[in-house]
């Protein structure tokens, strides 16, 4: 076979290193083991990147996809962390970054009738590795839709209170053992006025309406509730919780964030 020119490995004279270069928007089938020991097949949108020293013109894009394919579809915290390490090896890089975002489904029964339905959540794995550090960084994020009901509206109004759907983006790093995706979702849902369901009959709708009315929370309450539960859990070394409410009486969102390092 004729030897082809390797343009990427040529020298670059501009003396500017690149923080991250790679591929993004790559869709890849994966399998996730859930808390009930079942394998869930889903499709992840993947980003893979490494640093590029100033002396090199380009990186080798095909090697990113090769590294992903080598590790197969079944992913957990341990197998996923092998991917950024493999990028370091294949591309002779000093730092690597991998991000995978995918829909995660779980069965959820309606609160009164017990009718089963599937709820979908967005889950994100973010991993970084460095050539001079044996410990790779892993961050798990769940994006959980919830219901919130306004405490101020309830206190002032003779009839009802405004309520809305919100999104909680909850990210954690683990201090020791990993925590199941489902447990993170449950933690967030327990802090809202009410959780969401995909199937509700009339008795269920009555129940969720009254449940939200009995548990009013501001967006500030929501992030503080999640923060308190996180800080009481020894499994976490860091967290970030962001809540966004799609206000039903405004054409804008309400928003709050808490981020803490729990190692000190």
Swiss-Prot record:
Give GO terms: molecular function aspect only.
GTP cyclohydrolase I activity
Catalyzed reactions:
GTP + H2O = 7,8-dihydroneopterin 3'-triphosphate + formate + H(+)
UniProt cross-references to Gene3D superfamilies, sorted A to Z: Urate Oxidase (3.10.270.10)
Q: In which pathway does it act?
A: Cofactor biosynthesis; 7,8-dihydroneopterin triphosphate biosynthesis; 7,8-dihydroneopterin triphosphate from GTP: step 1/1
EC no. given is 3.5.4.16
**Enzyme group, top EC level?**
hydrolase
Q: Which GO terms describe its biological process?
A: tetrahydrofolate biosynthetic process
Question: Mind listing the UniProt keywords for this protein, alphabetically?
Answer: Hydrolase
Record site: May be catalytically important: 150
Describe the function of this protein.
Converts GTP to 7,8-dihydroneopterin triphosphate.
- Protein family: Belongs to the GTP cyclohydrolase IV family.
Name this protein carries in UniProt: GTP cyclohydrolase FolE2
């Amino acid at each position: 076979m004729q030897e082809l020119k390797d343009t990427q490995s040529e020298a670059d004279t501009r003396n500017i290193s690149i923080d991250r270069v790679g591929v993004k928007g790559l869709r890849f089938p994966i399998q996730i083991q859930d808390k009930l020991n079942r394998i869930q097949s889903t499709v992840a949108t993947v980003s893979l990147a490494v640093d590029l020293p100033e002396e090199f013109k380009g990186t080798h894009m095909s090697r990113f996809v090769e590294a992903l394919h080598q590790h197969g579809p079944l992913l957990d915290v341990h197998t996923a962390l092998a991917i950024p390490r493999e990028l370091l090896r294949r591309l002779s890089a000093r730092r690597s970054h991998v991000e995978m975002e995918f829909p995660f489904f779980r069965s959820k029964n309606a609160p009164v009738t017990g009718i089963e339905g599937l709820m979908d959540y967005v889950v994100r794995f973010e991993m970084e590795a460095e050539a001079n550090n044996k410990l790779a960084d892993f961050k798990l994020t769940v994006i959980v839709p919830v219901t919130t009901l306004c405490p101020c509206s309830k206190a002032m109004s003779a009839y009802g209170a405004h309520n809305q759907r919100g999104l909680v983006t909850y990210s954690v790093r683990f201090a020791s053992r990993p925590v199941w995706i489902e447990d993170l979702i449950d933690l967030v849902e327990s802090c809202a006025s009410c959780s969401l369901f995909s199937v509700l009959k009339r008795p269920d709708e009555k129940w969720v309406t009254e449940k939200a009315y009995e548990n009013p929370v501001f967006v500030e309450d929501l992030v503080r509730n999640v923060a308190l539960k996180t800080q009481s859990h020894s499994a976490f070394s860091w967290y970030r919780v962001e809540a966004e409410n799609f206000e039903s009486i405004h054409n804008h969102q309400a928003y709050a964030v808490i981020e803490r390092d729990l190692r000190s």
